[in-house]
Amino acid sequence: MAIAEWRQQLANGEVSARELTDHHLARIEAVEPGIHAFLEVTAERARADADRVDEARASGEDLPPLAGIPLAIKDNLCTRGVRTTCSSRMLEQFVPPYESTVTERLWAAGAVLLGKTNLDEFAMGGSTETSAFGPTANPWNPEHVPGGSSGGSAAAVASGECLASIGSDTGGSIRQPASFCGVVGLKPTYGRISRYGLVAFASSLDQVGPFSHSVADAAELLQVMAGADPRDSTCLNAPVPDYCAALGRPVEGLKVGLVKECFEQEGLDPQVKASVLAAAQQLQALGADLVDVSCPRFNDGIATYYVIAPSEASANLARYDGVKYGYRAEDAASLAAMTARSRAEGFGSEVQRRILIGTYALSAGYVDAYYKKAQQVRTLIRRDFDAAFQSVDVLLTPTAPGTAFRNGAHADDPLAMYLSDLLTIPANLAGLPAISVPCGFDTGGLPIGVQLIGNVLEEPLLLQVAHQFEQAADVMKTRPEAAFIPG
């Protein structure tokens, strides 16, 4: 059921928040040995949160919009009093003394914290295999990855361990795992949701967003999380519209642009292409006009991203030196040796690789050739999107070139791993909102996602189109097999 339906049942007393929470905690206990979506399950807190909701309802109080709704939070969002590790040995014992703006707003809306979810270390990866605490399995097939970096959050929703979850998206880290796990994943406009309390990877690209079973649930969560925040100077001071009100509007007469560069990709799986084109035809059947558009520099996005993102990561991760907090190497001969050893032992290989790439790109002899040039190309990519939106309302592409790949398939080939974000990265570079919605399955039964991209702050239109497609296509009648439940 959708969040709105659960809210109604909770308000009517048909189900209690405690019962809903206990159901999901039991589900977590049953399937976690096979999925490993969670790094920490906060069962005691969840039950206490739920009991407070039930007490408020019993006393006749008006319940906030997410009262009693069990959520999971990606473990790179600070939660006061609950460990926030970023799936790294560097922060294995870090307990934040403050709350992120996102989680603060969710708790104020009555949401229940079930726990913190697994991710690629410091959100750097596309499979959740770089986590220092072990990989997460794809609920549709445990021999395949759930995507990344927010693989734990996606898998938790897909396997029914929570009603919805929160992730972060720097180059596709919400949309790609949403596609791989057969759930909805929304990356809002850059600055639409505060990043205060989000552990930084690449500050000009990072954005928080929801995973859910439906577009309507994504709209509900966005409604709570969006809005200005004086603690984040990049957060937009723009009015927050009623996102749910847009869902029922028809798509008739809207222009949907098919980005030709995306459908001409050499590595695009034919099954993915066919499924996504069928999704476009579904929108056409609903009255939308399909228009072929070109974004000539779309394919330059991945090279641009892998200069800018590692450069920002190199600067952001310089703070982890073993002095004030985080992992500290023992018995070092000097401060310099302690810092060097702490970083070498605390960071995994993928994080170290990206720090080195970024440090190189920012070095005195190469900053003009790499970093500044990448920023110039980023501007050109944004201009391509601006030109496209002169003639269409939303853009449509595959979310990923293929379906979820096998565990370990790209372990020795980081470039192949990076290519899984080929189709999602440009929206991050341009700061645009984008959503992945399930649109079908491959012959192996793995989900396929279609990506819709909107113009800046056009989340209402994006959600409108996504919801209308979702309702018409109804591809997600099935859920992952309960293969991990004992007995």
Curated annotation (Swiss-Prot):
It comes from the Bacteria. Signal peptide: none annotated. GO terms for molecular function: ATP binding; glutaminyl-tRNA synthase (glutamine-hydrolyzing) activity. Coiled coil: none annotated. Gene3D superfamilies: Amidase signature (AS) domain. GO terms for cellular component: glutamyl-tRNA(Gln) amidotransferase complex. It catalyses: L-glutamyl-tRNA(Gln) + L-glutamine + ATP + H2O = L-glutaminyl-tRNA(Gln) + L-glutamate + ADP + phosphate + H(+). InterPro entries: Amidase (IPR000120), Amidase_CS (IPR020556), Amidase_dom (IPR023631), AS_sf (IPR036928), GatA (IPR004412). It is an enzyme of class 6 (ligase). PROSITE patterns: AMIDASES. Transmembrane segments: none annotated. SUPFAM superfamilies: Amidase signature (AS) enzymes. Its EC number is 6.3.5.7. GO terms for biological process: translation. Keywords: ATP-binding, Ligase, Nucleotide-binding, Protein biosynthesis. The active site is at 74 (charge relay system), 149 (charge relay system), 173 (acyl-ester intermediate). The keyword Ligase applies. Allows the formation of correctly charged Gln-tRNA(Gln) through the transamidation of misacylated Glu-tRNA(Gln) in organisms which lack glutaminyl-tRNA synthetase. The reaction takes place in the presence of glutamine and ATP through an activated gamma-phospho-Glu-tRNA(Gln). Heterotrimer of A, B and C subunits. Belongs to the amidase family. GatA subfamily. This is Glutamyl-tRNA(Gln) amidotransferase subunit A.
